[in-house]
Amino acid sequence: MDMPNLRARLLVVLVVLSGFLTGAGVRPATAEALPGSLWFDDTPVTVRDGRLTDGQGREVVLRGYNVSGETKLAENKGLPFASVADAKKSATALRAQGGGNAVRFLLSWSSAEPVRGQVDTAYLSAATEQMRAFLDAGVRVYPDFHQDLYSRYLFDPDSWYTGDGAPKWAVDAGNYPDESCGICLFWGQNITQNEAVKQATRDFWHNAYGLQDAFLTTAEKTMAYVEQHLSSAEFTGVVGFDPYNEPHAGVYDSGQTSRAWERDVLWPFYEKFRARMDAAGWQDKPAFVEPNLFWNANISFQKQEGGLLDAGTLGPDYVFNTHFYDQKAISGIFMPGKAGDGQYAGDFGTVRDRAAATGTAGIVSEFGHPLAGTVSDKAPTVLKAMYQALDSRLAGSSWWSKPASSGSVLSGTQWQWDIYNGRHHEPMNGNPDKVLTSGDAWNDEDLSAVRLDDSSTPVLRQDARLLDRLYPSATAGTTVGFTYEDRSRDGSTTLTWNPVPSSLPNVSRLVGSGQYGLLLWRSDGTSAPTELHLPASFPTATTTVVSDLGTSYGPPAYTRTTPIAAAPEPGGTGSRRLLLSAPDTGVLHYALVTNGTTAPSTTLLTAARSELSAWAAQRAG
């Protein structure tokens, strides 16, 4: 595809559209720096040399959650929250309790364009204000026009299933058969078994009734509105846009393969969406593009060839964006028992490889596992294994012996963060006699990591040691390897998949039974520090750092001349970070961070540092 010329032609056509909102409101005055911001903060994230980087040139890792499945429901009119106050409360908890620095923010086409050709600016205003709540908390945002099973309006009031996405007028435009999934055990089977879903989806991709054109126009107007109604500083925190959730052909044309569909149908759509982003003022932000939904399915009969194999080099305009769910574990049939060490190293390694092959960064924008029901007992191990695979492409059992093979640290947003979990009031498909209240109130799902307690305070539904993690949010140079042993629990059992080897006795003694993370990186002259999120379980006063830069128990406050320091994360939520300053070039650095031994002696710290220095030189030098 000749993308530059295509974009140039489309920009000429779209320039008039891009100005439709210029009189709809004045951009807010530039906001002051967020509480806790330091001189190197508040810069945009872009793609450079196949990595997400900030304005200082540091490698950036985005970690957080999808906000939220509530957007799929009608009860809050396609918004993640009932109010801005709830959004603010949720954002603070996500940052301080959930350890997140980013959210995939769900939007609804149905709510944005309830009448064909008429964008609902009241909806866009409410959505933008809720986004602002996260940006003000120091959480980066990438919006997503979400859909599942194409539209709720395909489904009968008494149906077992529902969808979300396209507006009613888009469904009314087609003469679709009465929906039926036949013999279905899981809602996702509607994608390939429900003729109404299949035909409507195919019509979208083939632009029947001008559906795709209408969607693209609404997407552009939405992006223009957001750009114009956030301050420049706030808009800096918007990372990019996810054009379409979990794309699938619906129905393949005669003789068409899944790979050909990606090449001939899906990719041209992404090029059109990219041009709309440019016209709306998002030209410096990447599109987070997803391959065919089934490209990386881990059940063989579900898998379809894909992964944007024919898209060529994506470069800075795109991020390779995918989902991963362990369908074997979710099935309750194909995976007896629980997940173990290195369970998903291969699956997430494939994501790294495809992102590298396309010349861009990768992200797993959805992953998770049911927290209720017959397979919920697998959740602690499945999620631990998924986070382990985001951190490194190695199993814990082999990490210490070959850390330089660890690979990049992947960005990821867990599904999901819905504070209304278990408190919904959703008339399913508009049926007043079928009001859903439990779980996520959508197709029997229950995956939210958070809920509100009796005092309406957000509380975690999963082990905080699993969710609030140590991770390198910004690396000044190139990551060589990273691992984090979270010691999360499966019931009463503490899961330890990456123990410190006996060949490092002083490091092992220092860590003890505590949590620890270890980052290796090679500096590139960047003056801004390397930054790791400090979980709440790592109080500054009792956190130990052993590094080639020095040792510290209770790191001091940050200054430009302090090599190992701690500081608040921007946003004023109480979350914190470790800052490691090494403004040299081409030097291998390491930092072990642990909450193990209390008040370790200088002798122990020195001995542990000596062991780690020798190990790093041998294994990664």
Stretch-by-stretch model annotation:
Residues 1-32:
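Secretory targeting and sorting signals
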Residues 4, 330-334, 424-426:
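Short conserved micro-motifs at the rims of enzyme active sites and ligand-binding pockets
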Residues 28-35, 617-621:
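Low-complexity, acidic Ser/Thr/Pro-rich repeat tracts that form intrinsically disordered stalk/linker regions
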Residues 39-53, 59-62, 66-297:
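Active-site mouth of glycoside hydrolases
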Residues 50-54, 543-546:
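Short polybasic amphipathic segments
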Residues 90, 251-372, 391-392, 403-410:
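Glycoside hydrolase catalytic-domain groove-lining segments
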Residues 308-315, 321, 374-544, 567-620:
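Aromatic-rich peripheral "rim/lid" segments of glycoside hydrolase catalytic domains that contact
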